């Protein structure tokens, strides 16, 4: 049975420059990843109904740390450093990418990935790399096409269908939905997916503990 979590009770735990500074690697985490201007922080704030839980910046690329938020005991959301922003100094970009890659490859509690991309400019190279990596390690993915309010209904549906078809060859557990923090489009779909991931995995872990 799917448990419904109260995301409005989510609270900030810690910011860390890399995996070594994070909390103990247990429980369940779902990470939010995306280009630096994809609206990641806005999506987290909308999900949790908290205006400043995740810091939003007028300058994309300011989220340089891995940020952890607790939904419930052992259940966490993770805001990963934004990727692909051209105006960030190269040395800093490499540092972020290293921290991002290390988290994705070594964090055992990571059980789901939300990839956010602007609905008007979806599936850039780095977005596809992120999805392919998740598929390779059998991690389920929810793609959120953000800023959906910027398009009329017909154009929005066309983009949604285009991306859904484009990810089919990836052969993974990938769901694609339109999303808008401003108009609250797709927030229910995001909540349902997170509830499903967290509930399924908690049930499996409880069974393993009982053995």
Curated annotation (Swiss-Prot):
GO biological process: division septum assembly
Xref: InterPro entries: G_ENGB_dom (IPR030393), GTP-bd (IPR006073), GTP-bd_ribosome_bio_YsxC (IPR019987), P-loop_NTPase (IPR027417)
CDD domains (UniProt xref): YihA_EngB
PROSITE patterns: G_ENGB (PS51706)
Gene Ontology CC terms: cytosol
Chain residues that bind GTP: 34-41, 61-65, 79-82, 146-149, 179-181
Any GO molecular function: metal ion binding
Keywords, alphabetical: Cell cycle, Cell division, GTP-binding, Magnesium, Metal-binding, Nucleotide-binding, Septation
Positions contributing to Mg(2+) binding: 41, 63
Cofactor dependency: Mg(2+)
Domain EngB-type G: 26-200
UniProt record similarity statement: Belongs to the TRAFAC class TrmE-Era-EngA-EngB-Septin-like GTPase superfamily. EngB GTPase family.
Function: Necessary for normal cell division and for the maintenance of normal septation.
Xref: HAMAP family: GTPase_EngB
Protein's UniProt name: Probable GTP-binding protein EngB
Organism of this sequence: Pectobacterium atrosepticum (strain SCRI 1043 / ATCC BAA-672) (Erwinia carotovora subsp. atroseptica)
